Amino acid sequence: MEELIKKIEAEFTSFKQNATQLVNKGNKAAGVRSRRASSNLDKLFKEWRAVSVKAE
């Protein structure tokens, strides 16, 4: 579970950095990377939900 949390934190950091670059600098490549990161976060959150339910 701890490794999953680390993956989520890393992916969120990537999302935040790239989304900020898109908004502040208009960096289109950063927009693509931020959308990819948000998609990966969605998958990780679903995995988190499944793992946390099993842990209860």
Where are these regions (language model features)?
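Short, charged, amphipathic alpha-helical segments
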Residues: 6, 28-37
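A structural signal for well-ordered alpha-helices, especially hydrophobic packing surfaces
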Residues: 12, 16-19, 38, 42-45, ...
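N-terminal acidic leader/helix
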Residues: 1-22
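Membrane-interface helix-loop junctions in multi-pass transporters/channels
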Residues: 54-56
